[in-house]
Structure formats: structure tokens, C-alpha cells
Amino acid sequence: MRGRTCPVLIFLLLLSAQSRADTGCVDLAQLAHSTVGITRYFDEADRNAQPGLVGIHGTAWFQSPTTIVTAAHVASGMKLSTQEWKSLKLEDGADSQSISVRIRRLAGGHAEKLAELELQTAVSNARSVAIRISPLAPEDRVVTFASPNQRLRAVAGRFVQYPDNGRLAGTALFEIYEGDNRLVIDHGASGAPVFDCEGRVAAVISTVITQTLATPFGEMRIPTPWGSPNVVSVPVQQLMEFSEAQ
């Protein structure tokens, strides 16, 4: 059995997930309209370049009614740019709307960055959320959003650590689960905010850590053991660090 970090949590519009959990750490009404599913359906030119792929789905949160934040690899996978406006579908529960977006900037000094996306039209019911400036402490409880079937659902977890060396240096590690399901954070959750118990964004989900078990029927993906981290995130404080546009 060996461990690996899944490099992309983007939902390729082909997959689904399952689950349900205790999120008593924070009043979920406080988080209403703060987080949206985002989908870009590719045009013919993009589909010709990637046959069989019709679009990309991820998650984002409102920094303001005209700005959303997601993981940089989500923006890259959607082929967004700083110059050209491209249409995204924003989904908030049963409500959805199409809005043109472009990259305002990429923030962070590590391999995975955060992407601020500018909306051409303001979202009237958007709830801008506060950013946590101070670092989390080990065992701090958190809440984030899973994206089974492209429908956001709150799930709970805890903060584990900020690695200071190796390939995960500069990230924030969490253990996120829903009941016995340690694979609840999966395809589509990239870009989801991780909230502390005061409803402030502390990090943004980037990747998931899993293990691979060899079986007579092929390799099977299984979760990491209980008590160990299973989600890699980008600390939100990177929004205040070096940024670039590209």
C-alpha cells in the first residue's frame, strides 16, 4: 500500500460523490450565499483540444459581490485569463446564473496559488466572508463544503498542521470527514473555503491525500488512517502575499 496526493480535485463533469456530517462548529446560516459551485462549459475549440471533456467544475467563495476566490489550478483548468471574459455558471443551492469572469490576480508564493476572479456583473445576494488573519492551532475545528453531484454540502473536520518543509511546505493540512466517510472531499471541492468556528475563511482546498491498495482486481483508492490529514489546502493569508497576473 502506498500514499499519494491526488493533484486535481476538479470535477470533470463525469463523476459523483456521497456522504453527510456534523457541522455544529458554526451556524450554517452565517455561511449562506458565501460559497458557490462554478462550472465552465468548453466551447468547440476547447473540446477539440481535449476530446471527451465538456467542462470543468470547482468551488469558489465571495470576497465581494464582484470577486470570487478559488484554487489557481481550477482557474487554469477552466482556461481563464486576465484579458478575455469567459462565461461561468455559478450555482448557489437551487439558484444558478451565468456570469462572465476573468482572472484579476494569482496570489501566493508556493506551487499552488489562489486565484481572484473578477465578475463582470455583481451578484446581488452574495455574502462576502471575513478572512482569518491569525494561523490556526492544531485541533481547531473547521467546516468546509463537499461537492457531491455538483451540490454543495457542509462537512466538518479539524486542523492538523502547517508543514514547514518538503513538498507540502506552505500548505495547511486538515482531516475532513462525514461520519465514517473520509473521502467526502473529492472531485469538485477544489477552491472550497475552510471556515473556522467564527465563520472566517482560514484556507482554500487544493488537493486530497489518499492511499492506494493493490488488489487482485487492480488498484483501489482508500483513505488515509484516522487521525492523519487527508486534505491539503492553501492558507488564505497568501492573499496578502506576493501576487501576479498572467
Give names to the regions the model predicted.
Residues 1-7:
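Bacterial N-terminal signal peptides that target proteins for export
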Residues 22-27, 61, 77-80, 102-107, ...:
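Active-site substrate-binding loop(s) of clan PA
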Residues 24-25, 45-71, 191-192:
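A conserved glycine-rich beta-strand in the N-terminal activation segment of trypsin-fold
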Residues 32-34, 56-58, 64, 84, ...:
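Envelope-exposed proteins and targeting segments
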